């Protein structure tokens, strides 16, 4: 039996049978299975050869595997794949980062928490952590999109003294022990934390880029890497008697064809009012 664990615009994440340890990430961006298989291979090499030098040990362990096309795979993928022009489905096999039997809570558009008997996993998309002297890109975009219920951004967690209050507010009403909040606050402040490392990586890549409205950089490989780093997902696993462990996923190369969209959105944000500053 095949179960869909997660759906995105370009990928499905599947589980097979009673195997709770491994998940299989399949590209569904194109209508052709062969095309999607090639994209999966390309994304695998991109993650290891381009993104991993930026994020190091935080990059999730993964391997390429080919699964024979079967009826159950056809069933779960039929709404996305129209042309079955290959006999196997190429997948990224990855560890399941959510504890078996845990209770999952969607906190908001960017944050989930998974509470298990022995571990708590904080899942989040930090988005833009690199600096913008004019306004907060994350919070201003939330207002532009009408997401007014989200009163924080992950960039604020890196400001001294703000992580604790934000985390307490974020997980209020959920069954998380005070030690989880305390340990996460201390972890975020460490130079080796995933948020700190991701911010440094974003800043280093962005330092070589001009404004988004410059045609020579809007679709460059460096711009695509910058956008990949701003759309990753982080999983931070917490155990009571151990240091937090972080893993980063969603490392696909962003298509250069989106450069016009990136430029238009940036221009829209620059005109939008009110812009959020903090």
UniProtKB/Swiss-Prot annotation:
Predominant place of localization: nucleus
Compartments reported by the entry: Nucleus
EC number: 2.7.1.158
Catalysed reactions, as listed in the record: 1D-myo-inositol 1,3,4,5,6-pentakisphosphate + ATP = 1D-myo-inositol hexakisphosphate + ADP + H(+)
Domain of life: Eukaryota
Record-linked Pfam families: Ins_P5_2-kin (PF06090)
Keyword set, alphabetical order: ATP-binding, Kinase, Nucleotide-binding, Nucleus, Transferase
GO biological process, one term: inositol phosphate biosynthetic process
GO terms for cellular component: nucleus
Gene Ontology MF: a single term: inositol-1,3,4,5,6-pentakisphosphate 2-kinase activity
Motif position, EXKPK motif: 123-127
Family: Belongs to the IPK1 type 1 family.
The record's note on its domains: The EXKPK motif is conserved in inositol-pentakisphosphate 2-kinases of both family 1 and 2.
Function: Has kinase activity and phosphorylates inositol-1,3,4,5,6-pentakisphosphate (Ins(1,3,4,5,6)P5) to produce 1,2,3,4,5,6-hexakisphosphate (InsP6), also known as phytate.
Protein name in UniProt: Inositol-pentakisphosphate 2-kinase
Organism listed in the record: Eremothecium gossypii (strain ATCC 10895 / CBS 109.51 / FGSC 9923 / NRRL Y-1056)
Organism placement in taxonomy: Eukaryota, Fungi, Dikarya, Ascomycota, Saccharomycotina
């Amino acid at each position: 039996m095949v179960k869909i664990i997660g759906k995105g615009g370009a990928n499905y994440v599947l589980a097979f049978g009673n195997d709770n340890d491994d998940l299989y990430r399949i590209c569904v961006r194109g209508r052709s299975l062969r095309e999607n298989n090639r994209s999966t291979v390309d994304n695998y090499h991109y993650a290891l050869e381009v993104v991993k030098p930026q994020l190091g040990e935080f990059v999730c362990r993964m391997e390429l595997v080919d699964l024979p096309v079967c009826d159950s795979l056809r069933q779960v993928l039929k709404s996305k794949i129209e042309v079955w022009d290959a006999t196997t489905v190429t997948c990224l096999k990855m560890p399941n980062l959510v504890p078996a039997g845990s209770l999952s809570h969607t906190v908001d558009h960017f944050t989930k928490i998974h509470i298990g008997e022995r571990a708590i996993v904080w899942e989040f998309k930090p988005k833009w952590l690199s600096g913008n002297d004019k306004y907060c890109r994350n919070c201003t975009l939330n207002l532009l999109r009408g997401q007014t219920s989200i009163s924080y951004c992950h960039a604020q967690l890196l400001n001294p003294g703000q992580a604790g209050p934000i985390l307490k507010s974020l997980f209020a009403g959920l069954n998380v022990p005070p030690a989880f909040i305390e340990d996460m606050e201390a972890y975020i402040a460490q130079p080796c934390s995933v948020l700190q490392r991701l911010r440094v990586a974003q800043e280093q890549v962005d330092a070589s880029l001009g404004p988004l409205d410059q045609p020579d950089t809007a679709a460059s490989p460096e711009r695509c890497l910058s956008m990949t780093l701003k759309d990753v997902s982080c999983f931070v696993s917490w155990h009571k008697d151990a240091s937090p462990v972080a893993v980063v996923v969603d490392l696909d190369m962003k298509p250069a064809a989106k450069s016009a969209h990136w430029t238009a959105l940036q221009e829209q944000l620059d005109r939008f009012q009110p812009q959020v500053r903090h």
